[in-house]
């Protein structure tokens, strides 16, 4: 990845392997033809609908982990959609939020120097408890890849878990504590963010309630490429 101003990008520990998506099946599996023509089965870490980001014939990149303890040596990391790389590994965003917190990726969170992962709050586990001289804040992270034009949307299917998280964040605010919701927009071509009302009307309703309650929403645009991953700043919220 070319040198960029600002905080450092995240780079994959080993080179990714390019291929073409041939099929995705049973949610967890993807058939990919590598550049050398070799067919491989890769783990698909995104078990959701993957609306708009699962086109057969599209270029993809896989990570390779030759660990005999693994059932599959390949993991599907990203797909190219209309010229834009989209990250589909749902295991990465939370890890990269923590990685980015330590490296100044998020100016809105710069006041927090310590954090704890997976803290119980209400009926849910919240991804992060942030700690700093100014006090505490709860941070939940949501990954989204669904886009309509330049607008990212979440969710792309009904998510009762996501609804509970919103209710818990609203309750945190009612108790006078800070609550933040970071949407990891796993593609660089979106400049706006909105709740996916078409797919989950209740989530959209709770999202607007959360805004009114003072939950701080941070829809972060993320640039994804085979060379690395970096933040691009906030998208505009369209509620």
UniProtKB/Swiss-Prot annotation:
A matching Pfam family: SfsA
UniProt-listed InterPro entries: SfsA (IPR005224), SfsA_C (IPR040452), SfsA_N (IPR041465)
GO molecular function, one term: DNA binding
Family: Belongs to the SfsA family.
Name of the molecule in the record: Sugar fermentation stimulation protein homolog
Protein source organism: Synechococcus sp. (strain JA-3-3Ab)
Lineage, highest ranks first: Bacteria, Bacillati, Cyanobacteriota, Cyanophyceae, Synechococcales
Gene: sfsA
């Amino acid at each position: 990845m070319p040198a960029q101003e600002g905080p450092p990008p995240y780079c994959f520990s080993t080179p990714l392997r390019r291929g073409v998506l041939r099929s995705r099946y049973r949610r967890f599996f993807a058939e990919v033809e590598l550049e050398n023509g070799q067919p491989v089965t890769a783990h698909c870490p995104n078990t959701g609908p993957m609306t708009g980001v699962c086109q057969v014939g599209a270029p993809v990149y896989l990570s390779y982990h030759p660990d005999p303890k693994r059932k599959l040596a390949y993991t599907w990391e990203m797909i190219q959609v209309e010229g834009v790389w989209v990250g589909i590994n749902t295991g990465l965003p939370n890890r990269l939020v923590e990685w980015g917190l330590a490296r100044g990726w998020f100016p809105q969170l710069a006041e927090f120097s310590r954090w704890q992962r997976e803290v119980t709050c209400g009926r849910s586990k919240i991804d992060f408890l942030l700690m700093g001289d100014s006090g505490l804040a709860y941070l939940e992270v949501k990954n989204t890849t669904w886009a309509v034009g330049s607008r990212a949307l979440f969710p792309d299917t009904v998510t009762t878990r996501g609804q509970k998280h919103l209710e818990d964040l609203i309750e945190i605010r009612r108790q006078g504590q800070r609550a933040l919701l970071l949407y990891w927009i796993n593609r660089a071509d979106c400049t706006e963010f909105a709740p996916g009302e078409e797919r989950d009307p209740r989530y959209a309703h709770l999202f607007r309630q959360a805004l009114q309650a003072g939950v701080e929403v941070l829809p972060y645009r993320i640039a994804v490429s085979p060379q690395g991953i970096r933040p691009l700043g906030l998208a505009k919220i369209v509620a």
